[in-house]
UniProtKB/Swiss-Prot annotation:
It comes from Dictyostelium discoideum. It holds the Pfam family Peptidase_M66. Binds 1 zinc ion per subunit. Transmembrane segments: none annotated. This is Dictomallein-3. Its EC number is 3.4.24.-. Zn(2+) binds at H301, H305, H311. The keyword Metal-binding applies. Its main location: secreted. Belongs to the dictomallein family. Residues 1-19 form the signal peptide.
C-alpha cells in the first residue's frame, strides 16, 4: 500500500504538475503528553518566555483539520528532503475517545499515530488527497509543508534506592523485591506523563540502605541528634530531609551531580513500638525524591520537584504559573498513547475526587470540575484506570529545560555530550573545572566508571555529643570514582592552594579542614582531603563560621561522602581534623570519628 501511494504521488506530480498548494489546512497538532500546535507552544509570564517542543524519538499522534473534512487525506513525512513515510489519515469519526467516555476532543480532525523513528529534528509534514480530473486520470492535490518544532530526544534514567531504617525489613514492612524498582506497567504510564523519549527505572547499584540508626542534622531550631525510631523525629519532614541529604552525597560521589539522572528512595522505617511508620508525604528537589513505597501520587509529585517543578498554586500566586490556583484550566488536553485516548482537563466520572469535587474545585463553563496539577494536589483527579494524574502543559517546559541543561555520558564511546537548543543537536563536550573549582571539579563527572567501590558516608558535629560524629556502615557496589586529592601528596596539594594553585578556589566555599583516612586489610592507607571545612564563605585560611559552636545551627554539622576502590577489603575508616589541609597532615591528627569493619 505504501509503495502504491508513493508511486501514485510521484506519477501524478510528474504527469499533471498538479501538486500545487490547493489543500487548505486549518489546524495541525501533535500529541505526546499534551495536544499542542505543530510549532510548539509558548508562554510569556511577566517577560519570562517558556516554550514547549515536541520531544524527539517519541511517537506522536498527528491531528489535522481541513477546509473540506469529507475528503480522504494522506500525509507524507519528510526528513532531509527524503520521503520516509506516506500514511492514510483516519477520518474524524475514528478519532480516539476521551477517558471514561468523556466529551470528544474534536469532530473535525483527521488523525494518525506517527512512529518514534519519524519524530526527529528536521522532519516536515505534507498532506495530500488523490482525486480524479474527470477524464479518468488521477490528480494529486497537496498542502504546504508543516515544520514541527521537534526538540531534544533524551532518556530519563532514574535510580530507586529504598531506605530500611530502625530495623525495618522484608517481613515487618515491605519486601525489597517490591520496593527496589518500578515495574514495567508503571514505567509505561510514567512515560505518558513526562516529557521524555524513554524512561529507565533501575534499582541503584547500592541496592538499599539498611541502617539501625540515623543521624539528624540541626533543623528548625532543633539540634542534631541520633535517632533509632521514627517517633523521635521533631517534625514530619525531618527524616525525609535527612534522606535527601544522603542522596545528594550519593549522586555526588557517583559523579552524577551534573547529569539528568534522578534518584527516588522509598522510605520504610519503624516507630517506637517496632511497627511500620508511614511517612505520610514526601520531599523532593535537586534530582532527588523520597516518600512512601507505593510509587503513586506522592512519588510522581516529588519527582516533579526533583525536575525543578514548584507547587503550582504557589507559582500561580507569584505569577510564574499560568493557570488559576494550580489547576489545568487553560492547559491543553493530554493524550495517553498506551490507552489510545485523550485526557480532558476536567475530572472524569471514575476519578477518586469526582463525587464531591464541586465543593472545592474550579468549575468550567460546562459545569465540570477542573483537574488540579500533579504539583497542586492533583492525585486522585485521574480516571480509575490510571495510577497518575496529569501535569499542566506549561510544566513540561520546566521538565524539558531540566534535560537541556544536563551533561550526558555516551556509554557507546565513553564521551560526554550536551544539547544545543539553537542548532537542535547534541555536541561533543569535555568536562571542565568551572569557577576555579569553587563548587567542585571536572563538572562533577567521574574519572573511572563501572568499577567496584565502597561508598563511605559520615557525619560530624563540632559541638557533640560524640555520637553525632559517625561513620555509617560501608556500602559496596559497582559504581564510579571521582578525582580526589591526597593531603599527604605535596604535588596534589599544590594544585588546590587557595588563590595560587591551579584550582585556586577549591577550598573557598567552607575551607578544606577534614580528611578521610581508610586503612585496608594489607595495612595500606588512603587519604582523601574533603572539600569541606569550618570556614566562612571565601575565607579558606581564616575566619571560622559564625555559628560553628551553636548546636542548633547547620554551621556546627557536616555530612559527607566519598567513593573508594573496592579492590581491597577495608579494615577501618577514620574522619580526621586536618585544618588548612593543603599544608598536609600531621601524624597525630585528631580523630573525629572512627569505625572498624
Amino acid at each position: 500500500m505504501k509503495l502504491i501511494l508513493i508511486l501514485i504521488f510521484l506519477f501524478s506530480c510528474i504527469l499533471f504538475i498538479n501538486c500545487e498548494n490547493l489543500i487548505k489546512v486549518l489546524d495541525v497538532r501533535l500529541a505526546q503528553t499534551h495536544v499542542i500546535p505543530v510549532e510548539g507552544k509558548t508562554w510569556n509570564l511577566n517577560n519570562n518566555i517558556q516554550h514547549m517542543s515536541i520531544v524527539g524519538n517519541r511517537r506522536a499522534f498527528l491531528l489535522a483539520s481541513f477546509d473540506d473534512p469529507t475528503q480522504t487525506y494522506y500525509t507524507t513525512i519528510w526528513f532531509n528532503d527524503k520521503l520516509v513515510g506516506p500514511l492514510k489519515l483516519n477520518d474524524p469519526s475514528q478519532l480516539p475517545p476521551t477517558e471514561d467516555k468523556g466529551e470528544k476532543y474534536s469532530t473535525v480532525h483527521h488523525s494518525i499515530m506517527l512512529s518514534k523513528e519519524w519524530v526527529k529534528v528536521g522532519m516536515k509534514i505534507q498532506f495530500f488527497t488523490i482525486g480524479n480530473d474527470g477524464n479518468g486520470s488521477s490528480v494529486v492535490k497537496s498542502s504546504d509543508f508543516f515544520y514541527p518544532d521537534v526538540g531534544q530526544d533524551y532518556t530519563l534514567k532514574m535510580w530507586t534506592l529504598p531506605f530500611y531504617l530502625f530495623g525495618a525489613n522484608d517481613t515487618n514492612t515491605q519486601p525489597f523485591s517490591k520496593t527496589k524498582g518500578i515495574d514495567s506497567e508503571i514505567t509505561k504510564e510514567l512515560i505518558e506523563k513526562w516529557s521524555c523519549s524513554d524512561l529507565q527505572a533501575i534499582n541503584h547499584p547500592i541496592q538499599k540502605i539498611d541502617w539501625s540508626y540515623f543521624v539528624m542534622e540541626p533543623r528548625n531550631g532543633n539540634p542534631a541528634m541520633v535517632i533509632t525510631n521514627s517517633d523521635q523525629k521533631k517534625d514530619g519532614y525531618a527524616i525525609m530531609s535527612g534522606v535527601l541529604n544522603i542522596l545528594t552525597q550519593i549522586r555526588k560521589v557517583f559523579g552524577e551531580s551534573s547529569s539528568s539522572i534522578q534518584i527516588y528512595s522509598p522510605l520504610l522505617h519503624l516507630d517506637s513500638k517496632g511497627k511500620y511508620a508511614d511517612p505520610y508525604g514526601g520531599l523532593g528537589g535537586g534530582s532527588r525524591g523520597t516518600g512512601d513505597y507505593t510509587y503513586k501520587g506522592i512519588f510522581i509529585h516529588e519527582q516533579g520537584h526533583a525536575m525543578g517543578l514548584p507547587h503550582a498554586g504557589e507559582a500561580f500566586d507569584k505569577g510564574t504559573f499560568p493557570y488559576q490556583k494550580g489547576s489545568l484550566s487553560g492547559s491543553e488536553w493530554g493524550f495517553d498513547a498506551n490507552h489510545n485516548e485523550f485526557l480532558g482537563n476536567f475530572l472524569p466520572p471514575t476519578a477518586e475526587y469526582y463525587r464531591n469535587c464541586q465543593k472545592s474545585f474550579l468549575i468550567d463553563n460546562k459545569g465540570r470540575c477542573i483537574k488540579q496539577s500533579v504539583m497542586q494536589g492533583g492525585a486522585g483527579d485521574q480516571s480509575s484506570k490510571y495510577r497518575f494524574s496529569m501535569f499542566a502543559d506549561y510544566e513540561m517546559t520546566t521538565i524539558q529545560n531540566y534535560f537541556k541543561n544536563s551533561i550526558y555520558y555516551d556509554e557507546t564511546n565513553g564521551t560526554y555530550k550536551k544539547w544545543n537548543d539553537t542548532s537542535k543537536s547534541y555536541y561533543d563536550y569535555k568536562p571542565i573545572t568551572q569557577n576555579k573549582g569553587l563548587w567542585g571539579i571536572d563538572d562533577g563527572t567521574p574519572i573511572e566508571r563501572d568499577i567496584d567501590v565502597y561508598t563511605i558516608l559520615f557525619t560530624h558535629s563540632t559541638v557533640g555529643p560524640k555520637e553525632l560524629s559517625q561513620i555509617y556502615p560501608l556500602l559496596k557496589s559497582k559504581g564510579n570514582l571521582m578525582r580526589q586529592f591526597d593531603p599527604t601528596n605535596k604535588t596534589e596539594m599544590a594544585i588546590i592552594i587557595p588563590n595560587t594553585g591551579a584550582i585556586p578556589w577549591y577550598c573557598h566555599d567552607s575551607g578544606c579542614d577534614y580528611t578521610v583516612r581508610v586503612t585496608f586489610d594489607d595495612n595500606s592507607l588512603q587519604h582523601v582531603l574533603l572539600q569541606q571545612g569550618k570556614r566562612k564563605y571565601w575565607k579558606p585560611m581564616s575566619d571560622l563560621k559564625d555559628n560553628i559552636m551553636d548546636p542548633k545551627s547547620s554551621d556546627s554539622f557536616m555530612l559527607g561522602g566519598i567513593n573508594v576502590k573496592a579492590n581491597k577489603k577495608i579494615n577501618k575508616v577514620e574522619l580526621l581534623e586536618t585544618l588548612l589541609g593543603w599544608n598536609g597532615i600531621s601524624n597525630n591528627a585528631t580523630v573525629l570519628a572512627s569505625k572498624s569493619f
